[in-house]
Amino acid sequence: MPRCWIGYLGVLSVRWSLISAVVLWAGAVTSSAAPPRDAEASVARQLQSTLTTNAKPAISSENWGTVHGRVTFVGDQKSHIRPRRGGVQADPGLVVHRANRGLKNVVVWVYRPRPIAVHPAYDVDATGTATITRWNRQLLPRIQTVRAGQALRLVNRGPAGMAPMINFLKNSPLGPALPAGAAAMQFRIQRAEMIPIRVSDSIVPWLTAYLMVQDHPYMAVSDANGVFELANLPYGQITLKLWHESFGYLQHVTWNGQPAELTRGKLELSVDSSIIDVGKIELESNSPLP
């Protein structure tokens, strides 16, 4: 082969080597540039996940417990009568289940000599409105619970006018006139009260209800079976108070089969699990036990 051809082939070989090297280098650059973009996307996803998770901490059920129990009346209802024009009547506030002796309308609340943590589930209730309605010759509900700062709404659904009277201990008294068919009236209750406050009607004296005002949501009213429940209490020592309109503070009771003295209705408990069963509290007459 002539030398000119050998030289020409050598030049072509060198050119192809250079082109291959450039192509390989370009591929290497493209390949190495992609991982940083993928890494950025991965970091962004992780950051977004972290922000979403930490935006509002989840409530741990391990920090809150629910307390429930039952109150029964084993005394004689016939001994609880009240004089009324035209004769006598049984105490309308003393409602006892005929079969299981459950005592209705026992007010149970957390006594608060110090601040207590409130579960976020109660945030919505704090801005709600509590209502007492005159209907069918009654004030309903018989016991209404209200948080300090909430609004109280008074409604007259009866055929005649009413003049509700609420003589608070810590708040200004209320005595509005509500003619039949009048629009409801609304008031804001600002301060907690020590005990349930009676709501009466100066026109119809036997119309009665009670209003319990506290600066926390941990209040309950026993149902027709005498059962009460306080949900989402913070862990720790608490003091409950028990009160009924026919007896005042429940003091001389039988608690789970044993005589017990509850000073001013106080019951000490430790909330240390998700469910605390107080058991059964029996009341006979609220007189000192032998």
Please give the residue ranges for each predicted region.
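Bacterial N-terminal signal peptides
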Residues: 13-28
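N-terminal secretory signal peptides that target proteins for export/translocation
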Residues: 1-14
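Sec/Tat signal peptide C-region and signal peptidase I cleavage site
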Residues: 30-32
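Extracytoplasmic copper-binding redox domains, predominantly the cupredoxin/blue-copper superfamily
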Residues: 34-290
